[in-house]
């Protein structure tokens, strides 16, 4: 036992290295992990004190624990047995598939990434691209929501900037959990979105096992009080108009709700509108060609950042106009269940109606609505736009103008349209290009619900 042996130096170094790694892994690392976790918990406690809606423990749970909880959920277990029987597949194989679905769905939220990086990045990007305006805030109604209720922000989907804009504007209230489509399952978006609490869904995948796993995750998060953001339209509007609601996530929330037993759910309608939607031409082309999906590309982002740097250097920064957000009247699910017996279709229609009521009115859609209605004379355009502003304000819709000078606002809008080759102005007459007519209609439809009963005797009736 005490006999001396010769060991090569390289082997001794290797043995010492393995011993050091083992000591770190078994002795030091658990203590370090415990210390870091305690630091994180204290940081979250301090953060929760300044948030209107605290970050829930469910959101902070280890991702692996949530996956296993979902995998062994009784309802998922029943779905596994049913699926195995119907498709003549072994239950253990189906169980592995259910766990794979759970790994695909469950996020890995990082409070540091969300509040340390994402909020700052969202604020910078939003302010770089747009002049951000908040219309109807409904502050009193939002503050009156019970702290024990689960808040679900329900939004129209105009642009992929919606995620960025609402993440920043809701930062003082809570951390939002988004359902994100398959378009974003590319590097580096996928790991970033997971760390921000977003979960990926296959919108058109009707596999009953997958749907059950997804439904149970949504129901668990809702019952745990996780603040969520939902786009009931299920995708970007390709026509500019509000789309019919798709009821998947809303129906999961309703199905998991038990009146008088479950934690109450409060839906908060959020309306978004822009002077310029970055994807407008892509959406219009997809609608014309009947394309079913979009391929995500980093090229437009790279191109914009390159132009932004150049504009900063030359001192000529041009933003895309106004991006406006309005919050509608909150709707508790408990009251809805009593009044409507919990029909998801009725809930979807009611929420989309509340969104349209507070749709922000911004200059570009105002001008587009008048031009799409037939106004071609520049002198008549001022009166036509003013009539629409008066009509929107009479309906208590939030109207956002960059200045009180309406002629300046219209001239700025027309200049932007000319730069984008949508129209030309010759001798005071507006001449639309073929591309411009489609884009005008796209933006006009965003405020069309507010203008449905536009007075027949309005100042531009002769031009319509």
Regions found by a protein language model. Give the residues of each.
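Membrane-interfacial terminal anchoring regions of lipid-handling membrane enzymes
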Residues: 1-229, 234-464
């Amino acid at each position: 036992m005490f006999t001396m042996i010769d060991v090569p130096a390289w082997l001794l170094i290797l043995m010492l290295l393995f011993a050091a790694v083992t000591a770190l892994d078994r002795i030091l690392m658990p203590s370090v992990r415990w210390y870091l976790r305690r630091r994180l918990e204290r940081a979250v406690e301090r953060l929760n004190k300044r948030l209107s809606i605290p970050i829930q423990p469910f959101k902070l749970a280890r991702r692996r624990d949530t996956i296993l909880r979902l995998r062994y959920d009784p309802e998922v277990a029943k779905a596994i047995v049913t699926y195995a029987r119907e498709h003549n597949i072994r239950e253990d194989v189906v169980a592995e598939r259910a766990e794979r679905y759970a790994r695909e769905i469950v996020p890995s939220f990082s409070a540091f990434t969300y509040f340390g990086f994402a909020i700052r990045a969202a604020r910078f990007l939003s302010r770089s691209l747009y002049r951000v305006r908040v219309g109807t805030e409904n502050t009193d109604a939002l503050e009156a929501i019970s702290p024990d209720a689960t808040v679900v922000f329900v939004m129209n989907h105009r642009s992929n900037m919606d995620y960025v804009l609402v993440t920043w504007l809701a930062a003082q209230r809570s951390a939002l959990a988004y359902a994100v489509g398959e378009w974003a399952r590319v590097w580096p978006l996928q790991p970033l979105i997971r760390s921000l609490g977003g979960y990926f869904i296959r919108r058109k995948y009707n596999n009953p096992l997958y749907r059950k796993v997804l439904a149970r995750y949504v129901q668990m998060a809702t019952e745990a009080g996780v603040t969520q953001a939902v786009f009931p339209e299920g995708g970007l509007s390709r026509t500019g108009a509000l789309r019919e609601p798709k009821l998947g996530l809303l129906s999961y929330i309703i199905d998991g709700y038990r009146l008088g037993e479950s934690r109450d759910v409060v839906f908060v309608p959020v309306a978004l509108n822009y002077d310029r939607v970055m994807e407008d031409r892509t959406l219009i082309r997809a609608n014309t060609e009947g394309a079913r999906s979009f391929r995500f590309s980093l090229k437009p982002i790279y191109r914009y950042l390159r132009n932004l740097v150049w504009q900063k250097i030359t001192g000529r920064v041009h933003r895309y106009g106004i991006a406006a957000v309005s919050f509608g009247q909150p709707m508790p699910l408990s009251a809805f269940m009593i009044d409507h017996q919990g029909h998801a279709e009725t809930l979807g229609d009611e929420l989309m109606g509340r969104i349209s009521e507070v749709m922000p009115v911004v200059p570009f859609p105002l001008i587009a609505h008048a031009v799409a209605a037939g106004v071609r004379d520049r002198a008549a355009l001022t009166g036509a736009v003013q009539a629409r502003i008066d009509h929107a304000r009479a309906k208590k819709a939030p109207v956002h103008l960059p200045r009180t000078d309406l002629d300046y606002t219209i001239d700025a809008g027309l200049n932007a349209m000319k730069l984008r080759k949508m129209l030309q102005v010759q001798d005071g007459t507006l001449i639309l290009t073929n591309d411009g007519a489609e884009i005008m209609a796209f933006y006009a439809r965003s405020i069309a619900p507010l203008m449905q009963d536009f007075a027949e005797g309005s100042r531009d009736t002769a031009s319509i």
